A protein has these predicted regions:
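Short hydrophobic beta-strand element within catalytic cores of glycosyltransferases
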Residues: 291-294
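Conserved donor-binding/catalytic core segment of Leloir-type glycosyltransferases
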Residues: 130, 171-175, 182-201, 206-212, ...
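Donor nucleotide-sugar binding/catalytic pocket of nucleotide-sugar-dependent glycosyltransferases
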Residues: 124-180
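Short alpha-helical donor nucleotide-sugar binding micro-motif in glycosyltransferases
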Residues: 260-266
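Aromatic "clamp/platform" in nucleotide-sugar-dependent glycosyltransferases that forms part
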Residues: 274
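Nucleotide-activated donor-binding/catalytic signature segment of Leloir-type glycosyltransferases, i.e.
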Residues: 161, 226, 234-254
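A charged, aromatic-enriched C-terminal amphipathic alpha-helix characteristic of glycosyltransferases
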Residues: 41-45, 315, 319, 332-365
Length: 366
């Protein structure tokens, strides 16, 4: 089967996802993308540019998969010879549920809902919609209902059910390599941060807790990874100074091999995020035997099977602190649990498994 993937924001996790699927898939996948910058302009203008590029292609596709950053109605209206080709949306994020920076001028000017509307019309016109977690799917549908309820008339509320009836969950596949160093990993506690340096990841809770633990004389080491932009939370600078004596690495890692090696040095990943539709960075860390400490919210109870792994979850900030202290002080006793969780995660989300699921799912669409 020949698949075309349309990506206005071909960068970061979006690029990682489709490139990995292309590598493991039995289908032929062609990628049509634009550089990942100026996301608002990509959601508005990307469809026009990509439609022009599509019309230059001398190839017939069986299926078109579109990123949530694409304005699908505009794209389809400008494309030649596309009417009989099925188009599906894959939602990494959506602009109804995704938290905006309070400093964004579009919020003050009441322009922020325009991007959610693009998601709405795209999911309405698509032949099918996939979401990277059930939490994401339900969050999107609930926020869409709220959005339509705010409209003055002709709210088209029945369109929510139309979208719901052609939507399902297709978890993200990950390139997971099982560490061979578990015996050494659980000698000394090494805490890992490998998420984006963004406010929605709630770094303040983690680092303020680590400051407290340092003052209490609790011994641990720290590895801080993750992509950062110019306007990152300043708690990272404070952490770099206050915890300098505990830091093994601090900053973005450009090499994939170096990144994996650093994951393999860590054994605890405390998660404090207020927003996460999936959690690739956490899946990667857990596959390297890091013991996850997870909030009981977002996609985590779904991905990490809360009913069978309650030991990994917390519900309050105090519970988070106490659980982190316990894991640090008793790191050796958590080795067996981490091994079990890691094996389950690899078996479930590695591309060797997920690519087969993707391939069969997309075949059923056409």
């Amino acid at each position: 089967m020949n698949i075309l993937y349309i990506e206005p924001y071909y960068s970061g996790s979006h690029k990682y996802w489709i490139n990995s699927y292309k590598e493991f898939s039995k289908h032929n996948i062609h990628i049509l993308g634009l550089p990942g910058r100026k996301w608002k302009w990509r959601m508005h203008g990307g469809a026009v540019t990509l439609a022009n590029e599509f019309n230059k292609l001398d190839k017939k596709f069986d299926l078109i998969i579109c990123s949530d950053m694409l304005n699908l109605p505009v794209f389809k209206s400008l494309c030649n010879n596309i009417d009989d080709t099925k188009c599906v949306m894959y939602f990494h994020e959506n602009q109804f549920s995704y938290p905006w920076s309070p400093n964004d001028p579009d919020i003050k000017l009441n322009r922020d809902l325009n991007y959610g509307y693009i998601n709405y019309t795209s999911s309405l016109i698509s032949d099918y919609n996939f979401f990277n977690s059930n939490y994401h799917k339900e969050s999107y549908l609930n926020e869409l209902k709220k959005y339509l309820n705010k409209m003055p008339d002709f709210q088209n509320k029945d369109s929510v059910d139309v979208i719901k009836n052609k939507s399902s969950v297709l978890h993200i596949g990950c390139s997971l390599t099982k560490s061979n160093s578990i015996q050494n990993q659980f000698v000394e506690p090494v805490i890992l941060w490998n998420h984006r340096w963004e406010y929605d990841k709630n770094p303040d809770l983690l680092f303020q807790t680590l400051f407290d633990l340092d003052e209490m004389g609790i011994d641990y080491n720290l590895i801080v990874l993750g992509e950062q932009h110019q306007d990152y939370p300043k708690i990272f600078d404070e952490a770099k100074n206050k915890l300098e004596h505990k830091i093994l690495h601090f900053g973005y890692c450009h090499s994939r091999d170096d990144y994996v090696n650093l994951l393999n040095q860590a054994n605890i990943i405390p998660v404090t995020s207020n927003q996460d539709f999936f959690g690739i960075s956490i899946i990667e860390a857990v596959s390297s035997f890091c013991f996850p400490i997870l909030p009981y919210r977002l996609s985590y109870p779904e991905l990490f099977d809360y009913n069978n792994n309650k030991i990994n979850f917390y519900k309050t900030d105090i519970e988070f602190k106490n659980k982190l202290i316990d894991v640090i002080n008793n790191i050796g006793s958590y080795k067996k649990t981490s091994n079990t969780i890691s094996s389950n995660i690899i078996n479930q989300y590695d591309w060797s498994t997920m690519a087969k699921k993707y391939d069969s799912t997309f075949l059923k669409i056409i």
